[in-house]
Every structure is written in structure tokens, then in C-alpha cells.
């Protein structure tokens, strides 16, 4: 079972699309997009994604990708 990375379409429009494009190239991740993840305050503040149900944020797409991989390393699923 791969880690699940979920993006909000509104946050993609705010800049996290670049992070999504990078993460989608990793065959060890399941990357999904939803209309809304109901994290509107977080969405307005910074780029974010849900990683296995937990919020991970970054100020830039590169930082978001780095933070997602760090989160996955520090929180193994098994």
C-alpha cells in the first residue's frame, strides 16, 4: 500500500500544482485530487496536501514536496 497524497483543486490553483506534478512521477505514491478537502483556512495560508490524512504544508512547491517526503519517512505506514 502506497502513501496517499491528496490535493485540493483550489490549492492546486494557488500554486501546489507544481508539487503535484513532481509527486505524480513517483510510482510509490498515490496522488489524488479533490474539489475541496475542507481545510479552507489552511488552503488560504499556504500550499498543502493531506498525506495519509495528515496536513503537510510548505511555502513553495519545492518545500511542500520536501516536507511530504520528510513526513512519509518519519511516519511509516507499517
Curated annotation (Swiss-Prot):
Domain of life: Bacteria
InterPro entries cross-referenced by the UniProt entry: DUF1450 (IPR009910), UPF0349 (IPR022916)
Family the entry assigns: Belongs to the UPF0349 family.
NCBIfam families hit by this protein: PRK13669.1
Designated name of the protein: UPF0349 protein YuzB
Species annotation: Bacillus subtilis (strain 168)
Lineage: Bacteria, Bacillati, Bacillota, Bacilli, Bacillales
Gene: yuzB
Amino acid at each position: 500500500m502506497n502513501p496517499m497524497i491528496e490535493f485540493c483543486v483550489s490549492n492546486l490553483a494557488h500554486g501546489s500544482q507544481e508539487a503535484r506534478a513532481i509527486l505524480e512521477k513517483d510510482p510509490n505514491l498515490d496522488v489524488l485530487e479533490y474539489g475541496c478537502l475542507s481545510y479552507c483556512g489552511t488552503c488560504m495560508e499556504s500550499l498543502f496536501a493531506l498525506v495519509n490524512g495528515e496536513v503537510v504544508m510548505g511555502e513553495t512547491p519545492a518545500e511542500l514536496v520536501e516536507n511530504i517526503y520528510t513526513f512519509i519517512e518519519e511516519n511509516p505506514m507499517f
